[in-house]
A protein has these predicted regions:
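Catalytic machinery of carbohydrate-active enzymes
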Residues: 1-326
C-alpha cells in the first residue's frame, strides 16, 4: 500500500509562545534530510521573529547550505570534537555564552544535552529535550521530524504554518544535461553506515527499464559512495543518464524541480525531491519509522517492508504512477 504524509501532530498542545526574543541560536547538525525537513521551521522562525538576530549552529558538511538560507543572519560551526579537545570545547563554550536570549535545539541529541548542561547560562532560555530545559518540548512520540521542528520554533514565537520558499536553493542553476525535463530520477544511495537501507540495485534497474519502455528518460544521482549501486544499474540498463558525482545541491534541486518523478531510499536527496514538489516515492526498511521520517511534500509517498528487499519493483512502479497521476 502506498502511504503519504498523515500530517497528524501528537503532543503539540499547550505550547507557550516565546517573549520578544532578540538573539536566538538554533542548533541543527544535519543530516541533509533533516536539514531539508527543517526548511519550513527555519522560515517560520524568521516569520515569527522578523527583527531577531537568528544564528544557526551546524556541522561542516552543511555550512555552505546554511550560509545560503535566507532566514538566518549568522552561521556557526560545530565540529563535534571529542571532549578531550579542550580548545574546541572552550570555543563552543564561547558560542553558547554569546548573549543569546534563547537556544532552540532542533537536534535534541546527547551532545546538545551536554551543551545545555555544561555551557548554557541560566538566563538563556533553552527549547528542547535536555534535562532541565526551561522550555521542554512536549511528547513527540509518533510525530514527523518536520512537525517536531515546527512545534519547537512555535514555542519560541515562530509560525509553524509557514511553508518555506525554495527559489534560493537552485537560484536559477541549470541541472546537468538541461535538467532532463520529465525524467525519472533514481536515488539508489544511502548512508554508508546503514547499507541495509539500500533497495537492491536490480530493483532500481527494473524501474529504469519499465520507465524507458514508456519513452521516459531515466537519470541516476548520488555521490562517489553510491558508485557501486549506480554501476550495477547502468550495467543492466545502459540507457540511463549517469549523474553520480556530478550534482551539487543547487543542481540537484534544479534537476528534481524539472523531473517527472523521483524514487529513492531513505536519504537526503529523496527528502529534497519531495520538498520541491516532485512526485517522490521513498522506499523504507525496518530501520526507518515512517511516523517520524516520512518525506514531506505535496506529492510524496512511501512503501515499507521490514526487509527492504521485499518491496517488489512492480509495487514501486504502481505507487510511482499513482503519485504522478495525483
Amino acid at each position: 500500500m502506498l502511504h503519504g504524509m498523515s500530517g497528524k501532530i501528537r503532543g503539540g498542545q499547550g505550547v507557550t509562545q516565546g517573549a520578544a526574543l532578540k538573539r536566538v541560536l538554533v542548533i541543527k547538525h544535519g543530516a541533509l534530510g533533516d536539514m531539508v525537513q527543517g526548511f519550513d521551521a527555519f522560515a517560520g522562525l524568521r516569520a515569527g521573529l522578523p527583527d531577531a538576530h537568528l544564528a544557526l549552529l551546524t556541522t561542516p558538511p552543511f555550512l555552505d547550505l546554511a550560509s545560503r538560507m535566507p532566514w538566518v543572519d549568522e552561521v556557526l560551526c560545530d565540529r563535534r570534537a571529542p571532549v578531550v579537545n579542550l580548545a574546541e570545547l572552550w570555543r563552543m563554550r564561547g558560542i553558547f555564552r554569546a548573549g543569546w536570549d534563547a537556544v532552540i535545539d532542533l537536534q535534541c541529541s546527547r551532545r546538545t544535552a551536554q551543551y545545555h548542561r555544561r555551557f548554557a547560562p541560566a538566563s538563556t532560555r533553552w527549547f528542547g529535550t535536555a534535562a532541565g530545559a526551561s522550555d521542554p518540548y512536549p511528547d513527540f512520540s509518533g510525530v514527523n521530524n518536520a512537525d517536531r521542528m515546527r512545534i519547537g520554533i512555535e514555542m519560541a514565537g515562530g509560525d509553524r504554518h509557514v511553508t518555506a520558499g525554495l527559489d534560493w536553493l537552485d537560484n536559477g542553476a541549470a541541472g546537468p544535461d538541461g535538467d532532463l525535463p520529465g525524467a525519472t530520477v533514481l536515488v539508489p544511495g544511502c548512508s554508508a553506515a546503514k547499507p541495509q537501507k539500500r533497495w537492491p540495485a536490480d530493483r532500481f534497474a527494473a524501474i529504469a527499464t519499465a520507465e524507458m519502455e514508456t519513452g521516459r528518460k531515466v537519470a541516476i544521482v548520488g555521490t562517489a559512495a553510491d558508485r557501486e549501486a549506480a554501476d550495477a544499474i547502468m550495467n543492466a540498463t545502459p540507457g540511463c543518464v549517469d549523474l553520480v558525482g556530478r550534482t551539487g545541491l543547487g543542481e540537484l534541486a534544479a534537476l528534481f524541480r524539472h523531473a517527472g518523478a523521483v524514487i529513492g531510499n531513505d536519504t537526503g536527496p529523496t527528502f529534497l525531491a519531495a520538498r520541491v514538489g516532485t512526485p517522490t516515492l521513498m522506499l523504507m526498511g525496518a530501520d526507518t519509522d515512517p511516523s517520524m521520517s516520512a518525506p514531506v511534500g505535496a506529492r510524496a509517498g512511501w512503501l515499507r517492508e521490514d526487509r527492504i528487499s521485499e518491496i517488489a519493483s512492480d509495487d514501486a512502479l504502481a505507487a510511482l504512477d499513482r503519485l504522478r497521476s495525483g
